[in-house]
Amino acid sequence: MAAGMLTDREREAIVSNLTKDVQALREMVRSRESELVKLHREIHKLKSVLQQTTNNLNVTRNEKAKKKLYSLPEQCGEQESRNQNPHLCSSCGMVLPTSPEFALEALSLGPLSPLASTSSASPSGRTSADEVRPKAMPAAIKKQGVSAESCVQSMQQSYSIPIPKYEKDFSDKQQIKDAIMDNDFLKNIDASQVRELVDSMYSKSIAAGEFVIREGEVGAHLYVSAAGEFAVMQQGKVLDKMGAGKAFGELAILYNCTRTASIRVLSEAARVWVLDRRVFQQIMMCTGLQRIENSVNFLRSVPLLMNLSEELLAKIADVLELEFYAAGTYIIRQGTAGDSFFLISQGNVRVTQKLTPTSPEETELRTLSRGDYFGEQALINEDKRTANIIALSPGVECLTLDRDSFKRLIGDLCELKEKDYGDESRKLAMKQAQESCRDEPKEQLQQEFPDLKLTDLEVVSTLGIGGFGRVELVKAHHQDRVDIFALKCLKKRHIVDTKQEEHIFSERHIMLSSRSPFICRLYRTFRDEKYVYMLLEACMGGEIWTMLRDRGSFEDNAAQFIIGCVLQAFEYLHARGIIYRDLKPENLMLDERGYVKIVDFGFAKQIGTSSKTWTFCGTPEYVAPEIILNKGHDRAVDYWALGILIHELLNGTPPFSAPDPMQTYNLILKGIDMIAFPKHISRWAVQLIKRLCRDVPSERLGYQTGGIQDIKKHKWFLGFDWDGLASQLLIPPFVRPIAHPTDVRYFDRFPCDLNEPPDELSGWDADF
């Protein structure tokens, strides 16, 4: 029957059948997507198990842990089960990593029944052991932080230690420069710094068959191939070959890292150019400090700006852009509207003026040179230029600042002409906080639980593991009472080997002196021959990372609450001149009420209000561009990381992520505008993320004149109860029931550490 002959009832039947078919297909797609998600989770679990098993291959089956801390006594009904199964650890009752059950249990949804605890609910009504038993293993791998050696000593000596220079002819310099500009990461370095790097590279000859770098070894040098042929190898297999003029090993000039490939010489008379990491850091630091000092001195010479605080002058110096004008160029034309201010850094300009609008002749008024400025009235309002400014031969370099950038940093200058342009109340609060921290005697920082000894602590369970050590849940028996703490155990030898002593002391001082409900408390510290210990507040609600892993992502209201808690912590820290530098879900914990606390201050540092620091540290997916490029950084990096965290909470993954750290850094340097946001992330959330993750630090929300209040007032937070959060009267979006003080149901399971670290007796921790 022709389509036009169909009755209304027949058409409705056809439409109904088609609708059913579409619904069936949609259901099939949803089912397949669900299966795909499950498969991805199983893959993540398998990766986690393989990684954990690989890390424990060196553990011998018969080796026993020698603990300084005393284990929790066996519970009823467990001893018999452990004696019957040789694959259970005698100390903690967990499956040994060397046993076949370890891999099977980690892949299952829960513990295998033959290995499960047999204890039942106690008469007191506590939850049974099975109900509080932690999950088997993480289904995804946690992000790891990285750090170079502390730059504190280098900053103090940056001008006193000469930077090494090595003679080269023009072709050698050009070869190195071309290799740098051909590298995705190195090409982002400023031209003036590239010249310094080229001058500081030295030549090294390498025989045929020798390795320039070896896979698995820790590196500290950048190389540029100068002559010969080289093989790129992984696990003994040749992946590629390269000739002269290629840069490689660039990750090693940022921080201590393990080489992921080998470079072997194939030809005779091979030669490379070499740059040491310490020299790279010194160059970047010295040039950065010199640039800031010069710019601030320039700005201070301008009467309109002379009353600005050191902090604001440093901020303005950050947004100054270097522009070159060829000889004869009109930088400013008389009578045109202007919105930019200029400082001459190199060269000369001629100032001319037409005496009348109709006059064909320009009268020369004077010549301006290095250190002079013009166009400053444009910072106040739209200025009609009253003269011409013309670049003289051979050209002129100017530092420029536009009115919009200036207003974002300090507000309307018209309202501040007769007073200090700095934020007086904020500066006073920061000064008082810093003096309080600086003047506080060391004895006062360790007053809580002064009579508690390391031997008073009894290990209940492991809450987490990392490269530096473990975090244990412990009971403290003292003064006729029992308290519960988290004990962070850090291997002293590993700290010394990675040159992290300065970071550990900084973490100790900052945490002992911090008093905020949004920051995990550090009560006191201990030390022995093998470890330094931090006795911390136990946050038994578990990690935000674990919740994110299990849920996939958070809804807006939950993400807003988490970010709100982080902002409260940042407001406290930044007011005291402290930057955090390691924000990520792995470092956020829930207390028993469901409030979020920041933990792990290993990368935190007190730098004051107008200073910068140069140490590369953070988590690759979260580091800001200025950290990657060694430009010097301050609290603006925390606002960048806040934007990354919002994206990860709402989407389940950070916006910049790649299998290799250097690939991740290159993605970060391309910028947030290159990221395609998923449709389920709201428009206001996307806008906030983009305003936090600006390449230029001074353009980030939170770093401008309104401070953190600018973030709190953003439309993504519309209707959020900030007063309720600050007073902790706001009901959290997730409250996780905790049966008793040692209920570890919200933590993953971890095997015993059977490798006892060597003694470390250098004495660096004498004041710990």
Swiss-Prot record:
Share an example GO biological-process annotation for this protein.
larval somatic muscle development
Q: Which SUPFAM superfamilies match?
A: cAMP-binding domain-like, Protein kinase-like (PK-like)
Catalytic activity annotated for this protein?
A: L-seryl-[protein] + ATP = O-phospho-L-seryl-[protein] + ADP + H(+); L-threonyl-[protein] + ATP = O-phospho-L-threonyl-[protein] + ADP + H(+)
**Annotated region described as Disordered, given as residue ranges:** 114-134
Question: Pfam families annotated for this entry?
Answer: cNMP_binding (PF00027), Pkinase (PF00069)
Main enzyme class: transferase
In which residues is ATP bound? 463-471, 488
Give GO cellular component annotations, separated by semicolons. Answer: cytoplasm
Q: Which cofactor does it need?
A: Mg(2+)
Domain Protein kinase, by residue range, is 457-717
Q: Could you tell me where the Low complexity compositional bias lies?
A: 114-127
Positions binding 3',5'-cyclic GMP 1 in this chain are: 249-252, 259-260
Write down the InterPro entries for this protein, in alphabetical order.
Answer: AGC-kinase_C, cGMP_dep_kinase, cNMP-bd_CS, cNMP-bd_dom, cNMP-bd_dom_sf, Kinase-like_dom_sf, Prot_kinase_dom, Protein_kinase_ATP_BS
List the residue ranges of the region (Regulatory): 1-192
The AGC-kinase C-terminal domain, residue ranges: 718-768
Q: In which tissues is it expressed?
A: In embryo stage 13, expression is seen in a few large, irregular cells having the appearance of hemocytes or macrophages. In adults, expression is seen in optic lamina and weakly in testis.
Can you state the subunit structure given in the record? Homodimer.
Q: Which family does it belong to?
A: Belongs to the protein kinase superfamily. AGC Ser/Thr protein kinase family. cGMP subfamily.
Misc. remarks from the entry: cGMP-dependent protein kinase 1 consists of 3 types of domains: the regulatory domain, two cGMP-binding regions and the catalytic domain.
Q: What is this protein called?
A: cGMP-dependent protein kinase, isozyme 1
Upper classification of the source organism reads: Eukaryota, Metazoa, Ecdysozoa, Arthropoda, Hexapoda
